């Protein structure tokens, strides 16, 4: 082999080593932001960042690393985020930030501000899964200083509930918002969700929340199961099908489902029918057409649109349960 060939081979080797070192540094020397927590008291903003400093590839959403929390404050949302970034051990990388947690006392203002900011700054995604939370960033920081596992448990909680959570860009039409709570070293979602619309925010009962998820084709569980605490006893449903029909001047909501109970509780179908109609009316009052009655009306009558600004139409529910 000639001297020139040896030089070319050595140059290629040096280049490969340099590229490997560069890629390793680029992938690991970052603080990967996994979730953004935002709250405001009207005069200032407080931000919390759940981040990890991975030892594996930064492109892997399952990178093995402990989850940590840092916070920042500022008169504006952008300045609060910048302050939180300065508290990170390494420069921030937002590629894996898929979750936004808003304080339940300032949900509407927080979500509107985040949507506007994300349109111009790469701090998050308009497709971020959105959650409410009953605790402040300060309380989370205090508890996280006492136990290292809390931030990681919080992230795991919202990851588990993510399929049932709405996305940020859906706020203009309203949505059902799950609320996360802290309990010792763990976190869990509250059985009672919020209805968030541009007009107002209201709370559903536990049964209404479960029915609202059922009508939307969502579930808290990985198996798609729905659980109801009826007066006659607990009921577990799966493989639900929901449909809307026009019945004269009123709407008919059909719900068919498989029951996982060995024996159906007495009057289970009647209880679910009443709950279904009650949930639709409650959401309608808060400004959310959860069953798409307006869209069904528009398809039927063309130009005429039924919106939540109108009085809620008459509703009848028909529930049919079958054993697995």
Give residue spans per PLM region.
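Membrane-proximal alpha-helical signals and transmembrane carboxylates
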Residues: 1-324
């Amino acid at each position: 082999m000639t001297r020139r060939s040896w030089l070319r081979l050595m140059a290629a080797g040096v280049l490969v080593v340099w590229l490997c070192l560069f890629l390793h540094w680029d992938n690991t020397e970052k603080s990967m932001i996994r979730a953004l927590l935002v709250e405001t008291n009207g005069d200032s903003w407080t931000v919390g960042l759940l981040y990890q400093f991975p030892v594996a590839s930064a492109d892997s959403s399952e990178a093995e690393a402990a989850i940590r929390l840092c916070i920042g404050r500022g008169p504006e949302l952008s300045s609060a985020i910048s302050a939180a970034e300065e508290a990170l051990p390494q420069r921030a990388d937002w590629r894996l930030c898929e979750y936004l947690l808003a304080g339940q006392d300032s949900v509407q203002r927080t979500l509107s501000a985040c949507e506007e900011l994300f349109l111009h700054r790469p701090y998050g995604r308009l497709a971020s899964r959105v959650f409410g939370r009953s605790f402040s960033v300060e309380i989370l920081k205090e508890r996280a200083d006492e136990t290292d596992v809390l931030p990681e448990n919080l992230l795991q909680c919202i990851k588990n509930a993510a399929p049932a959570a709405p996305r940020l860009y859906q706020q203009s039409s309203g949505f059902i918002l799950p609320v996360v709570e802290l309990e010792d070293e763990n976190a869990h979602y509250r059985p009672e969700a919020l209805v968030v619309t541009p007009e107002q925010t209201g709370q559903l009962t536990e049964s209404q929340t479960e029915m609202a998820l059922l009508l939307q084709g969502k579930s808290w569980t990985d198996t798609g199961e729905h659980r109801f605490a009826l007066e006659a006893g607990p009921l577990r449903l799966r493989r639900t099908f929901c449909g809307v029909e026009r019945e004269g001047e009123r709407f008919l909501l059909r719900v068919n489902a498989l029951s996982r109970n060995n024996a159906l509780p007495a009057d289970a179908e009647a209880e679910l029918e009443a709950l279904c109609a009650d949930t639709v009316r409650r959401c309608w009052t808060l400004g959310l057409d959860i069953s798409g009655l307006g869209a069904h009306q528009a398809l039927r009558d063309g130009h005429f649109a039924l919106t939540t600004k109108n009085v809620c139409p008459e509703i009848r529910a028909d529930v049919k349960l079958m054993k697995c």
